[in-house]
Amino acid sequence: MIKWPWKAQEITQNEDWPWDDALAIPLLVNLTAQEQARLIALAERFLQQKRLVALQGFELDSLKSARIALIFCLPILELGIEWLDGFHEVLIYPAPFVVDDEWEDDIGLVHSQRVVQAGQSWQQGPIILNWLDIQDSFDASGFNLIIHEVAHKLDMRNGDRASGIPFIPLRDVAGWEHDLHAAMNNIQDEIDLVGESAASIDAYAATDPAECFAVLSEYFFSAPELFAPRFPALWQRFCQFYRQDPSQRLRVSAAEGDYGEESEH
């Protein structure tokens, strides 16, 4: 059990969100105009349904709130806003936060320790984030705290806790589990060879299936060029689940860029 020292400041609703400015981040640059319009519509509903709560003196404004909402809705762009119905609040610290974590061991003794967290998702509770890592989530780098925590929420729709297997048809579960564990083993092999800091995929993905799904969801949306060629079978499963193909978006965007450069000559 974690005790949260909340001192909160809730944002007020704003009907005039700066969507054009909010979209102007590398993570969202490859979306088509139609996808951007649908993402904005989802983000508007997100801001109507969820409370963004700033903690410990952090101040939210309309641009920050709009960008947070857009990133929350990117994974469910083709799934629908109801896939985010498992929580009502997003709590935002200014930086990674320290919490008191209490846990019970196998013989019933309760232990307490202070733990630094970047974010948290709970089955029946809010999503907790921090602004420093949210800012780092704007880039197309493979790191995205919001998508990571959203992936946990999507994962938990399939049961009481995150397992690494989201809500997919039963016939696909065995194949998903096989490919996910193969990816975990491959990532661990690279870590053993070059070390955690030099690994091309975040080492956290090798810790357990739930974290592997969440970490690879980050790469799926923000660095598909690192995910798709390395784990092609698992990539296709992610495409089927999310009903999106960020790698295809990247190819189309690159081709359009090349065409634009040729037209200038």
Curated annotation (Swiss-Prot):
Disulfide bond sites? none
InterPro entries per the record?
MetalloPept_cat_dom_sf (IPR024079), MtfA_enterob (IPR057256), MtfA_fam (IPR010384), MtfA_N (IPR042252)
List, separated by semicolons, the cofactors it needs.
Answer: Zn(2+)
User: Which UniProt keyword terms apply here?
Assistant: Aminopeptidase, Cytoplasm, Hydrolase, Metal-binding, Metalloprotease, Protease, Zinc
**Which Gene Ontology terms describe the biological processes this protein takes part in?**
proteolysis
Q: Where does Zn(2+) bind?
A: 111, 148, 152, 211
Cofactor binding remark: Binds 1 zinc ion per subunit.
Gene Ontology MF term list: aminopeptidase activity; metallopeptidase activity; zinc ion binding
Entry's EC annotation: 3.4.11.-
Give the UniProt subcellular location, in the record's own words: Cytoplasm
Q: Name one GO cellular component term.
A: cytosol
**Entry's CDD domains?**
Peptidase_M90_mtfA
What Pfam families has UniProt attached to this entry? Peptidase_M90
Quaternary structure and partners = Interacts with Mlc.
**Family membership noted in the UniProt record:** Belongs to the MtfA family.
Task: Give the protein's function.
Answer: Involved in the modulation of the activity of the glucose-phosphotransferase system (glucose-PTS). Interacts with the transcriptional repressor Mlc, preventing its interaction with DNA and leading to the modulation of expression of genes regulated by Mlc, including ptsG, which encodes the PTS system glucose-specific EIICB component. Shows zinc-dependent metallopeptidase activity.
What name appears for this protein in its UniProt entry? Mlc titration factor A
Organism in which the protein naturally occurs:
Salmonella gallinarum (strain 287/91 / NCTC 13346)
